[in-house]
Amino acid sequence: MSKKRIYEYAKDLKIKSKEIIHELKKMDVEVTSHMQTLEDDQIKALDKIYKPEKAEQSEKSQQKNTQNKQQTTHNKGNQSNKGNQNNKPNNKKNNKNNKNNKNNKNNKQPKQEEPKEMPSKITYQDGITVGELAEKLNVDSSGIIKKLFLLGIMANINQSLDDETLELIVDDYGVEIEKEIVVDEEDLAIYFDDETEDENAIERPAVVTIMGHVDHGKTTLLDSIRHTKVTAGEAGGITQHIGAYQIENDGKKITFLDTPGHAAFTTMRARGAQVTDITILVVAADDGVMPQTIEAINHAKEAEVPTIVAVNKIDKPTSNPDRVMQELTEYGLIPEDWGGDTIFVPLSALSGDGIEDLLEMIVLTSEVQELKANPEKNAVGTVIEAELDKSRGPSASLLVQNGTLNVGDSLVVGNTYGRIRAMVNDLGQRIKTAGPSTPVEITGINDVPQAGDRFVVFKDEKQARRIGEARHEANVMQQRQESKSVSLDNLFEQMKQGEMKDLNVIIKGDVQGSVEALAASLMKIDVEGVNVRIIHTAVGAINESDVTLANASNGIIIGFNVRPDTGAKRAADNEGVDMRLHRVIYNVIEEIESAMKGMLDPEFEEQVIGQAEVRQTFKVSKVGTIAGSYVIDGKITRNAGVRVIRDGIVQFEGELDTLKRFKDDAKEVAQGYECGITIEKYNDLKEGDIIEAFEMVEIKR
């Protein structure tokens, strides 16, 4: 058997040399390259893998040839030796021809197979190539390339096809086509379905959030509802605070989110969680519409949920419910009695008057919304609160929005995962299952999630762990990247990338007239690609609630003649919210227009880096005055700007010419060291002068 190189053997089989090399390495054969020659025993071993039929025939043929050789040797003596010498190359040639014949036979076998039938329907993903389409249709790719050519498209086998071209080609073959939807299992949002069309869906309790101005009676109203409707099962025990609770009214359950008002409401919405079905806007009848009332209205409008107005404190002598209704009409909340669609309920949270009417209106509104969920599915929902308990470890208060949650379920919560060890309801009772719209507290997760994070239950614990770990890693990577919050500095870049359609703006000013004038001016800005959208205006300092709303809406805050309070400044830094403070309306307009056009100039501030005292001066011809100096603070650097200060008055401001330490040039000289300094275009240096070095640093906005 003649020796062959690896690539020749692979070529005969019409396969890649890498496959042959891989098989040889499995046989513990050291392979250097595809040019390496194969030994006879190696070829035999490979034949058994790639050509088992040929290997058997080769063995039989070899045995037969051996017998013939022995017989010829006995019969013909010396002549046979001569004959064998003559026949030997012929045998090799014949063997080679036989091998080629067998290879040719093997090569022809696929052609002899019956052609596969063309499917009646195929599916595809974005970016499908000509070759992949040919494989799906069971046709030769050259036919598809020809059809594309007739359509005026020059393509090769690796050319990607768009949807329109794909439909034309497939329609020509008479085959139906359907696009595959690639599902990212790590995206928890895909597990949240609309249950209104599900045949197994049943009615679920409404989830209600109470908002309003401080001291208008939100907490009192919650307490009044709770004490009126919570069953005696709570008596004698301590209520478990899990951020929400359920009551029952005429056989209908209602879930109330017991959260700190606007902040939690918008924080959840900022993370994509649509938890609330109905908002209750509490307005004091003796106080009317206040700044936080307007904020609450804007929050509810942004969340696109129905609002019921609870006019509280009607038992006070100074109460005036009609005035409240009149004021709220200015914000689009028009009472039903006045031809609008907003429900107004007069009540007294302190005495309990009107509580029954409010609950009845909540039930009525929820019936109109047709809130449904399927309890047969795996549970999905949202985190209301979360904390790290020293004795129990990480715990989370969850609101089940669909399906049924069970003790022992494996789940992914935000960017963590776990298995439910224990579950407690709002009455502090241990339970094993929780249906839709039920608030519970669980333990058993690996880390503390954030309020507003979603949770999803998986049947397979390994799947939950895999998805949880992947989300955690992705979150770590995201935190390392720069904040994606919109600011005037990155506005143009986001516009170019198509990420920005509306620029959401919150305006706070010193007087109402200024706020209205600024809002009107901003609305007139017309730059192609993005619209200015005013989502909230108010008079007064910028507070933490403004920052929370800006973060939830991916907007910016403009302060006109006002400053942010301490909490707002800290929150803006933490959340990456852009705040712009101005005193001239024209400057606001110009800045936003420039940002939209990508021409916003960077802002710099001066940063003093060091000071040196002149101890002695030397005048040198062709050089000027050299100041023998001692660095008394910070450092002096070669590229810094400098100013000469004499008796507290700036004499000159310019740049360093040279900075030397002894006779050598220095990049910088630190505090406590002497140096020689010359200043460009300035020689009037005197002993006792202070040379101050400074740098201009770009302000991060």
From Swiss-Prot:
GO terms for molecular function: GTP binding; GTPase activity; translation initiation factor activity. Residues 348-350 are annotated as: G5. Keywords: Cytoplasm, GTP-binding, Initiation factor, Nucleotide-binding, Protein biosynthesis. Residues 203-372 form the tr-type G domain. Residues 237-241 are annotated as: G2. It is found in: Cytoplasm. Residues 212-219 are annotated as: G1. GO terms for cellular component: cytosol. The keyword GTP-binding applies. Residues 48-62, 110-119 have a biased composition (Basic and acidic residues). Residues 312-315 are annotated as: G4. Residues 48-123 are annotated as: Disordered. Residues 63-89, 97-109 have a biased composition (Low complexity). Residues 258-261 are annotated as: G3. The keyword Nucleus does not apply. InterPro entries: EF-G-like_DII, IF2_II, IF2_N, P-loop_NTPase, Small_GTP-bd, T_Tr_GTP-bd_dom, TF_IF2_bacterial-like, TIF_IF2. GTP binds at residues 212-219, 258-262, 312-315. One of the essential components for the initiation of protein synthesis. Protects formylmethionyl-tRNA from spontaneous hydrolysis and promotes its binding to the 30S ribosomal subunits. Also involved in the hydrolysis of GTP during the formation of the 70S ribosomal complex. Belongs to the TRAFAC class translation factor GTPase superfamily. Classic translation factor GTPase family. IF-2 subfamily. This is Translation initiation factor IF-2. It comes from Staphylococcus saprophyticus subsp. saprophyticus (strain ATCC 15305 / DSM 20229 / NCIMB 8711 / NCTC 7292 / S-41).
